Amino acid sequence: MSLGGSVRRHIAAIGTAIKHLLAPRMTVKYPDVHHVPIQTNYAFDPKRGAALPGWRGRHLLYLDKCTGCNLCYVACENIAEAIVMVTLPEEKRPQNKKSLYPAVDYGRCIPPWTNIVTSDGIVPIRDVKVGDKVLTHTGRFRTVTKVFRRRYTGRLYTFRTLGNIERLSVTEEHPLLIYSRGRTEWAFPQQIGYGSYLVRPVIAEYADPEEITFTYEMYHPSGRGGYFTLNHDSVKCTAELMRLIGYYIAEGHADRYRVSFDIDKKEVSIARDIVAAAKTVFGEDACLRPDGRSEGLKLVIDSVKVASFFSQFGTRSDEKHLPPWALRLPQHLAGELVRAIFAGDGHYSNKYYDYMHSNYFTIRTTSRLLANQLLYVLAGLGIGASACSQDQKHRKTCYSVTVHTPYIDKMAQVCGIEARNNPPYSHSYIKLIDGLILSPVIELDVQNVEDLEVMNLEVEGDNSYVASNQVVHNCVFCGFCVDFCPFYALEMTPDVELSEYRRENLFYTPHELAIPPRRLARPLVNPRFEGERVKHMAGG
């Protein structure tokens, strides 16, 4: 070898070493501290159909023991969705006549801006921490046990479903929960086309609070200056309070010293209800003040305490939102809340045409967060609703939450309006079945991304979470495949670190899982994606 060639090889080796040192890890190290024997690093609860998280590492495959029976694939199906069977013609072994071996995918994630439904509200996944509770496909809130971050290069799938203002973007191997042929099942993005039904759960955990506590600052003048004290107070959680909150979300504004409600002069019944509820709940009088900007009515409550209470719901129209406890109210209280919001910002359309009868309920708001939250509140009342956005020239974007047949009857009962379902002309493609809201895919986009930060969660018990109002699978390697293998061909290491530059390298082929592992000159690609094309057709 020439001197120049030797120098180039040494420089290349040093460059590779530096690149490895500076590159971020694609996944985290298992476990962080604790080490356990291989036999106890997984568990499975057959009654719940869920893999229980534990300490575990990557898979180990004994090629001389694997018979290609597919049992590991069957065990992984609908749990981790990480194993796929691949054919290796060069691996001719007597016990595996088809040369069929398992490969494992270790990388599935979503972008960090994706909104996640947690017990503390709807927040971006970048703000979710270990110990937080997230909504799962069962409608329950379960604890996050791991948070994963990595860089991703590959295809990014983006879905938009009917009645959902949020778009869901996932990497090419991140399973989504769909409803097909009368049941739910996990599907990969490339298997989902136009008309496929994605799902979101109805919140099944309710809390009936007796009272709501809050704090407020009170100013005390003293001499030339003064001082503030932090006071604690509470109000009973009653129907009157829920209606007052609903009126505030629709028509209210709060500053440091007062709360005001701007209503139309014809809405006399609403004005009377606000005055009565303010007196009953807070013991405060609501006075009428002229509104120089319009011919409407302005009801004002001059109270620092009351203003502090209502500030938790947002002070401006585009900032209005419900606190976390309001998403889990029992139906009798949630109904009063929706009734008041509809009275202030709602509309019932009942039109007859020569060819059809069209009727629907709609609530309009400039708060994107509130529109998303109302979908869950209405679902808890047994009402399937849809949300859409409309850009307005020189005005804020408007979000409409709409209810069609077959949910008109229930919405009419909640809002106190005479209305009936219109079965012959149902316009609702949003379905509520078995505690799940189903909505069809209406937009699908696939793009190639490079070095994009993506994230994933590991969720205790249910192994799923709600992202952009759709159920996605979490990251879990439970080891159930190890328990399912009758030939002891699979094991899992108690401690491993996966560190790769590109997404493709996180797909471990049978050779890379083997003992000892070996890389091929031309790595295999996941057969799920080789030569695939996205189907841009209805129901494709």
Predicted regions: what they are:
Residues 60-63, 103-106, 119-123, 186:
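Short, solvent-exposed loop/turn positions at domain surfaces
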Residues 66-67, 110, 128, 192:
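Hydrophobic beta-strand core residues of beta-sandwich domains
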Residues 129-474:
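Internal intein/HINT superfamily modules and their associated LAGLIDADG
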Residues 110-130:
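Protein maturation boundaries and topogenic segments
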Residues 1-103, 475, 480-483, 488-540:
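Non-ligating segments of multi-cofactor redox enzymes
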Residues 104-108, 112, 470-474:
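Short, intrinsically disordered, charge-balanced linker/junction segments flanking boundaries
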